[in-house]
Amino acid sequence: MTSVAGPHKRLEGKVAIITGGASGIGACTAELFHENGAKVVIADIQDDLGQALATKLGGKACYIHCDVSKEDEVINLVDTTVAKYGRLDIMFNNAGIIEGQGLPVSVVESEKSDLDRLLSVNLGGAFLGAKHATRVMVQQRKGCILFTSSVCTSIAGLSGHAYAASKSGVCGLAKNLTPELGKYGIRVNCISPYGLVTGVSNVSGEGEANREFVEAMLSELGTLSGQTLRADGIAKAALFLASDEAYYVSGINMVVDGGYSVVNPRLVDSINSKL
């Protein structure tokens, strides 16, 4: 009898760290990477969720507590991963926080403390993750560093100023790392999602009804009719960028927004009203 080959595992044999991996985009990506053959290290401060996910995924996954704003914890994360698995192929700097409810706030009502907090986690955490992953990947002469940014890097007025500043900084960091790390065979890319409901999105409130309401609102505001962006859409983008299929893709900001950022809705509405 001829055996039938199983589905192609796009990350077979690779080792991946996913920060913010206990919930939302991170958890969805951890599951997808695991399904595709990767050994997955889930890094987060949500210990119960992170450990539960690692247990669910089984032997090729583990959980490590890590506050990405603290360099000693990021060093421990990377060093423990390499000690356990012998290498590091993919560093997905996904951990992030929002300000307030994630909605636009007047600059005069914004607090410096919020800016400091968001820069420390969103941008500082991305910087530290890239820095210490690079230590390992340079020796391997190969690797992939990914960042989660936001569609607010492409279109203004969608978020608070501190959040927009932190996520724009992430895109700038990724772009600036690209030529330096390219010399060592390391690819660097950003993923910038349109609005979606995740564990970090306080706008969803509590309960499935609120989640469905916000998803419906985001879908209606979006440009791509009949589709709703969920965490799996970002996980699939990360899978492509982390896989060998993207072997020559580096330095991009992959905006996953259904075309939202290329449209001027006010202009479109004005034209349509006159037709």
UniProtKB/Swiss-Prot annotation:
Pfam families recorded: adh_short_C2
GO molecular function: oxidoreductase activity
Function, as annotated: Has no tropinone reductase activity.
Catalytic residues as annotated in Swiss-Prot or TrEMBL: 163
Taxonomic source organism: Erythroxylum coca (Coca plant)
Name of protein: Tropinone reductase-like 2
Family recorded in the similarity comment: Belongs to the short-chain dehydrogenases/reductases (SDR) family.
Positions bound to NAD(+): 17-41
Keyword Oxidoreductase attributed: yes
List of residues binding substrate: 150
Cystine residue pairs: none
InterPro entries from the UniProt entry: NAD(P)-bd_dom_sf, SDR_fam
EC number: 1.1.1.-
PANTHER family, per the entry: 3-OXOACYL-(ACYL-CARRIER-PROTEIN) REDUCTASE (AFU_ORTHOLOGUE AFUA_6G11210), ALCOHOL DEHYDROGENASE
Keyword line: Oxidoreductase
Gene3D superfamilies: NAD(P)-binding Rossmann-like Domain
